[in-house]
Amino acid sequence: MQGRLSAWLAKHQLAHRPLGFDYQGIEILQIRPQDWPSIAVALYVYGFNYLRSQCAYDVTPGGGLASVYHLTKVQDDADQPEEVCIKIFVSREDPRIPSVFWIWKSSDFQERESYDMFGIIYESHPRLKRILMPESWIGWPLRKDYIVPNFYELQDAY
């Protein structure tokens, strides 16, 4: 099912795949990683001036990874702002997605967290480094195929 935004992207010949709507009626679009920079700029020009959230998830054990962007069109006179959900799927072997930090600054920590937990590399991100785990940590803790290191942390009981 194609929504209003999908029709607008198709009219401007921007490659995407409509995935329908979520339970709140928010349109979901799939974008290829190589198309993401141009579509992100187009969405910003269209009025999606706020990146509400960005997250990632492991689709299946040993399968692909997904990066999800929730964009909102914030306007002074809008009772119900327009929203869209963008999903970008990448392979586990080459998990690279262009960063949108230069468009939405709020993606800074969110893309870093997705990198830290899933190993998705956000190309051209200015500070892509671990944000939750120590820099020396090996692996990506939220991947379904992650093997927990064999160690125990001792904590003081106060």
UniProtKB/Swiss-Prot annotation:
How does this protein sit in the membrane? Peripheral membrane protein
At the top level of its lineage, which domain of life is listed?
Eukaryota
| Compartment(s) | Plastid, Chloroplast thylakoid membrane
Question: Quick one: a GO cellular component term?
Answer: chloroplast thylakoid membrane
InterPro entries assigned: NADH_DH_suC, NADH_quin_OxRdtase_su_C/D-like, NADH_UbQ_OxRdtase_30kDa_su, NADH_UbQ_OxRdtase_CS
Gene Ontology molecular function, alphabetical: NADH dehydrogenase (ubiquinone) activity; quinone binding
Q: What EC class does the entry list? A: translocase
Q: What is its EC number?
A: 7.1.1.-
Q: What keywords tag this UniProt record?
A: Chloroplast, Membrane, NAD, NADP, Plastid, Plastoquinone, Quinone, Thylakoid, Translocase, Transport
Query: Which chemical reaction does it catalyze?
Result: a plastoquinone + NADH + (n+1) H(+)(in) = a plastoquinol + NAD(+) + n H(+)(out); a plastoquinone + NADPH + (n+1) H(+)(in) = a plastoquinol + NADP(+) + n H(+)(out)
Q: Is this entry keyworded Thylakoid? A: yes
- Biological process annotations from GO: photosynthesis, light reaction
Chief location of this protein within or outside the cell: plastid
Gene3D superfamilies, alphabetically? NADH:ubiquinone oxidoreductase, 30kDa subunit
Indicate the family of this protein.
Answer: Belongs to the complex I 30 kDa subunit family.
**PANTHER family to which the protein is assigned, alphabetical:** NADH DEHYDROGENASE [UBIQUINONE] IRON-SULFUR PROTEIN 3, MITOCHONDRIAL, NADH DEHYDROGENASE UBIQUINONE IRON-SULFUR PROTEIN 3
Function, in words: NDH shuttles electrons from NAD(P)H:plastoquinone, via FMN and iron-sulfur (Fe-S) centers, to quinones in the photosynthetic chain and possibly in a chloroplast respiratory chain. The immediate electron acceptor for the enzyme in this species is believed to be plastoquinone. Couples the redox reaction to proton translocation, and thus conserves the redox energy in a proton gradient.
Indicate the quaternary assembly: NDH is composed of at least 16 different subunits, 5 of which are encoded in the nucleus.
The identity of this protein, by name, is: NAD(P)H-quinone oxidoreductase subunit J, chloroplastic
